[in-house]
Amino acid sequence: MKTKGFERKRRIIVGVSGASGAIYAYRLIQVLADSGIEVHFVASKAGLEVLEYECGLTMVQLTQMVHKIYDVNRIDSAIASGSFPCESMVIVPCSMKTLGSLANGIAGNLLTRAADVTLKEGRKLVL
């Protein structure tokens, strides 16, 4: 991504909610990181549990794979703002609770707020 004569690092927000299929999130994070893309990560409590249960991925390992991990309860985090520069957001897996919240404009935590902002800013949101 080029802006005003300098190269800006590519950023993507990866969200994980509590649905089965955490291996997809794990693999996506690996591919993005290996491609030099800055990964900003947020997960619901259940999402973190599923990542650990299905993939054996601990917070220590996750911290080494992504640029930054955000607390799902901190609605004041950078990714909750439209001024946070990123290309897109992916929520994988996406639980029915998260999908229903997004479909009805309910942004009750950082995961759904970041997705809501992604849509508001006209960026791509992949579920």
Q: What is each PLM-predicted segment?
A:
Residues 2-126:
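A cross-family phosphate/adenosyl-ligand binding-site feature
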